[in-house]
């Protein structure tokens, strides 16, 4: 049987992950749904300025199941080819 991990305040925890095709090290952040969702919104903003380009390909947030996923096309202008980011939020479980 699996149960969702909770912090010391009794709040359920979620794992926020970013994986880029140009990096072997994923970014991982664990916190409550609200804080992970805030970070998700910050990381999925479309940008097009002198140094960076980011375009959303797919973005889906499910408040009902507390999951989120997004795919983005990115480019550090002047520093090579495009790369892709895959961003997710999922529940964090442990074996009980």
List the predicted regions and their residue ranges.
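Short aromatic-glycine-(Arg/Gly/Cys) micro-motifs in beta-strand/loop hairpins
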Residues: 4-24
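Short, mixed-charge low-complexity intrinsically disordered segments
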Residues: 2, 45-96
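Intrinsically disordered, low-complexity polyampholyte segments enriched for Lys and acidic residues
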Residues: 6-12, 35-38, 77, 95
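A short, exposed loop/beta-hairpin motif centered on an aromatic-Gly-Thr core
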Residues: 22-35
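Residue-level detector of alpha-helical secondary structure
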Residues: 34-37, 41-44, 57-58
